[in-house]
Amino acid sequence: MDKKMLEAENAAGGVVAPVLEENAPFSPTRREIIAAFLLYIGAYIYMGGLKSWRLAVFVILFIALTELLNRGKPRSWESWIWLGCTTVITLSLLLERAAVWEDFSLLFLHIFAVWWALSRSGGLLAGESGHLLPFDAMNGFALFPFRNFFLRIKTVCYALKGPFRGKKKSKPETVVWTIGALAAAGLLFWLVLRLLADADKGFAELISHWLLDLDFRIDGEIWLKLLFSLPVGAWLFGLLAGSARAEKEKLRLRGRRINDALNRLGKVPNLVWTLLTALFCLLYLLFFVVQARYLFGAFTRSLPEGFIVSEYARQGFFELCKVMAANFVLLWLVTRLSAKPLRENRAETLLCVILLLESMLFAVIAFSKLMLYISCFGFTPRRLQSSWLVCVLFFGCLCAGYSLLCGKKSFRAWMIFGAVSLALLHLY
């Protein structure tokens, strides 16, 4: 590069024009080549259904290839947490203990596996989990896989072209089509051989000894699995290799730009949010006063008149949880859309803290109703799910309050608490 610049300077009489570097030719690493070929097997196993040995083999292969592609890179401590959650859910499915979440367990397994791959490769926008969760999820499930969707076929073509590199140049597409043609010709040869054997008994007896060794039935389901495993494998390789190849400085820069864009949303006067937050706080306070006997009956194990335990415990439980979720949305709007930082306005900060305390009271009320129900009728998977939801919402209120009062980030702690508790419930 320096030599080129010197030559350009001499030729231009001291005036240097920018010298653009040529794009480097595509050259995958040996690790990427190994991963590309192994994922053909992994994707086919995946299409066979993630049960019993298939699940174990696929997860082990996914973890091994992720580690292979990111070997030598620094590992964040939280990546161990996501790997642990992935392992716990896998074991629960293998041991058939995923009674609490049932069919949702596979969905959670996919989410944790993708998040672990992002964390292990350093592919999270901020370098760690946090409030950029929606954008990181978009990267993990869409941008990385689909931007690098054809990376595997390019890698495979590069590897197959290796023995001929340095000789007469041949396009990667030529290699692929040649292999495809050989496979098709072999299949047609076997088919014609079978047809000739069916047409003539003498010919059938002549070749029966070695035809028996080639006698296998072409199962349509197998070909369908092979066909659909191709895009699945391309998606998986795009995720793993794409996140490993991503330039981390560009990712961090993009994360900072998103943060800057979020900070520029603050256009609403703080007084407006102060009045609106005060309105919500007064509404909840009025609700607590008017409905005190009904809401707090579970604490004294005294039911309101006309109610039975099951009706009292279930009525309004999910509505209370939805109110808490609505409060989180309101809190996000206040913190993001206020013209001035929230912590510079004491009245608004105090009202947000009161709102969180009322949300925590909603969680305690919902949990008391649930515990009354469980004490009478015992545990069931759905009641455990409900208990988990209330605990996660309550912990979220604590984290939000900590951030408001101390100005420190706590979203990652909330994510980890929710993830670890969800994974551990699979062991019930």
What spans do the regions from the language model cover?
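Transmembrane-helix bundle segments that line or gate the permeation/cavity pathway
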Residues: 45-53, 57-205, 224-249
